[in-house]
Swiss-Prot record:
Source organism (scientific name): Streptococcus pyogenes serotype M6 (strain ATCC BAA-946 / MGAS10394)
UniProt keywords, alphabetically: Membrane, Transmembrane, Transmembrane helix
Major location (coarse): membrane
One Pfam family hit: YtxH
Protein name: Uncharacterized protein M6_Spy0510
Any one GO CC term of the record: membrane
TM ranges: 12-31
Organism superkingdom: Bacteria
Length: 149
């Protein structure tokens, strides 16, 4: 019986959290920033619907670039280890260099995408005071609380 009450209490908490999250999302989407974000998402979706092949091609190209970078790194390290040209310290340095190159390439890709979308950019400035959720423990089971009301 106690297990069932805990399960009901947990379900009630999940229901409350879900409801509060839904209300918070609905409130946000009704604000100017929320409406702007929704409009931007709709525009992006429309652009995708108009030319999905362009988006797919872009994703394929970027995936191919990252794949080549990873493969080149693997074979570079493998060859150097086999020939004895690479020590443990050298391998760590090489790994750092390749990681830096990968991060730089990723940043460039994001910068390209950001530059394309800069015109329609929406800045959402939320802080912790925007949403308040009171999630306190209940001492009594849900069924007892419901019986009292």
């Amino acid at each position: 019986m106690e297990k069932k009450e805990k399960s009901m209490n947990k379900s009630f908490k999940n229901l409350v959290i879900g409801a509060v999250s839904g209300v918070a999302a609905a409130y946000f989407l009704s604000t100017e920033k929320g409406k702007a974000l929704k409009n931007r998402a709709e525009k992006a979706y429309q652009a995708y619907k108009e030319s999905p092949d362009d988006y797919h091609q872009f994703a394929k190209e970027k995936g191919s670039e990252y794949s080549h970078l990873a493969r080149d790194t693997f074979y570079d390290v493998k060859d150097k280890l086999a020939s004895g040209d690479l020590t443990k310290e050298d391998m760590l340095d090489l790994l750092k260099d390749k990681t830096t190159a990968f991060v730089q390439k990723t940043k460039e890709t994001f910068a390209e995408v950001e530059a394309k979308e800069k015109q329609d950019d929406v800045i959402i400035d939320l802080n912790e005071d925007d949403i308040i959720i009171d999630y306190t423990e209940q001492d009594e089971p849900v069924s007892d609380t419901l019986d009292k009301h």
